[in-house]
């Protein structure tokens, strides 16, 4: 068996096409969605990531609002930019690119953001709304994973899902999304400290690997016919980017998301979805 590819690039392109029509409809009503980004410092990886977000915006007609500060920016200077975007009616959603320079209180910065403009879906208030099953911007990567599974017809209802990872961006919120009544999956949350991880993986219909541990998920640990999504990012001794899933898993699983090219494009697409949905809510 060779797994079918869960193609995040193609699915993200389809989502962007749908968003283009929704943005055009908003503009006819006099509303232009705007994505703001706050970039502090000159880290090449962060610069590349933010530039990609603004290219995505241009493709669907979302306005770009870019705020860049030097690495020497103070806590007060960054907070001032956050307050400015909170008040700017042209900005319907924004992100603060992490990590911030050493000495900056990231949590304080994130808490200052207007929850309704939280394009990443990771504001403490919005994570709380997710726990309470109340409407709110959803975390981009977990929601992107769900969208990818749905678009390929992978059965989620009643599925046994193992989430490997416990980070705030994926591992923590992913089970909250999967156990909503609209999904009705049964979730086991594991991590690098889990005893006998293989025993859990072998029972899983869907594996979401987001631990940042190279090739943690091995072919012999995967149930034949499972769907396996590789969201982990780490580097080996030579500096090469590695995923959490061993390449041999593709010979056992029925579905697999490549890394890169699987979940990454979906994360960026869901960021745009959050911005457009915020604009639609404000338009009434």
Curated annotation (Swiss-Prot):
Cited InterPro entries: Aminoacid_DH-like_N_sf, NAD(P)-bd_dom_sf, THF_DH/CycHdrlase, THF_DH/CycHdrlase_cat_dom, THF_DH/CycHdrlase_NAD-bd_dom
Associated pathway: One-carbon metabolism; tetrahydrofolate interconversion
Reactions it catalyzes: (6R)-5,10-methylene-5,6,7,8-tetrahydrofolate + NADP(+) = (6R)-5,10-methenyltetrahydrofolate + NADPH; (6R)-5,10-methenyltetrahydrofolate + H2O = (6R)-10-formyltetrahydrofolate + H(+)
The UniProt keywords, alphabetically, are: Amino-acid biosynthesis, Histidine biosynthesis, Hydrolase, Methionine biosynthesis, Multifunctional enzyme, NADP, One-carbon metabolism, Oxidoreductase, Purine biosynthesis
Provide the function of this protein: Catalyzes the oxidation of 5,10-methylenetetrahydrofolate to 5,10-methenyltetrahydrofolate and then the hydrolysis of 5,10-methenyltetrahydrofolate to 10-formyltetrahydrofolate.
One Pfam family per UniProt: THF_DHG_CYH
Q: Does the keyword Secreted apply?
A: no
Q: Which organism is it from?
A: Streptomyces coelicolor (strain ATCC BAA-471 / A3(2) / M145)
Residues annotated to bind NADP(+): 165-167, 192, 233
What GO cellular component term, any one, is given?
cytosol
Q: Tell me the protein's name.
A: Bifunctional protein FolD
Q: Which family does it belong to?
A: Belongs to the tetrahydrofolate dehydrogenase/cyclohydrolase family.
The entry lists its GO molecular-function terms as:
methenyltetrahydrofolate cyclohydrolase activity; methylenetetrahydrofolate dehydrogenase (NADP+) activity
Q: What is its EC number?
A: 1.5.1.5, 3.5.4.9
Q: Which domain of life is it from?
A: Bacteria
Q: How does it assemble?
A: Homodimer.
Q: Name one GO biological process term.
A: purine nucleotide biosynthetic process
- Is the keyword Translocase assigned to this protein? no
């Amino acid at each position: 068996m060779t797994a079918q590819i869960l193609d995040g690039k193609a699915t993200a392109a389809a989502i962007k096409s749908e968003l283009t029509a929704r943005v055009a409809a908003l503009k006819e009503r006099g509303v232009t969605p705007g994505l703001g980004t706050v970039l502090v410092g000159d880290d090449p990886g962060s610069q590349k990531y933010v530039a990609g977000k603004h290219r995505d915006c241009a493709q669907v007609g979302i306005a770009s609002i870019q705020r860049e500060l030097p690495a020497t920016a103070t806590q007060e200077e960054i907070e001032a930019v956050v307050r400015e975007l909170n008040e700017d009616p042209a900005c319907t959603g924004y992100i603060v690119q992490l990590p911030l320079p050493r000495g900056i209180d990231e949590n304080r910065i994130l808490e200052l953001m207007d929850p309704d403009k939280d394009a990443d879906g990771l504001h403490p208030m919005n994570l709380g709304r997710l726990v309470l099953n109340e409407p709110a911007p959803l975390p981009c990567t977990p929601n992107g994973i769900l969208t990818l599974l749905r678009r390929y017809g992978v059965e989620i209802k009643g599925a046994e899902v193992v989430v490997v990872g416990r980070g705030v961006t994926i591992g923590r919120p992913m089970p909250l999304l999967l156990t909503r009544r609209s999904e009705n999956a049964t979730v086991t949350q594991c991590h690098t400290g889990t005893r006998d991880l293989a025993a859990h993986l072998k029972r899983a219909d869907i594996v979401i690997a987001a631990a940042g541990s190279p090739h943690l998920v091995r072919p012999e640990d995967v149930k034949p016919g499972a769907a396996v999504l590789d969201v982990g990012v780490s580097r080996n001794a030579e500096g090469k980017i590695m995923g959490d899933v061993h390449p041999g898993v593709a010979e056992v699983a029925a579905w697999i998301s490549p890394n890169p090219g699987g979940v990454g494009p979906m994360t960026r697409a869901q960021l745009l979805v959050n911005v457009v949905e915020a604009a639609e809510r404000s338009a009434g």
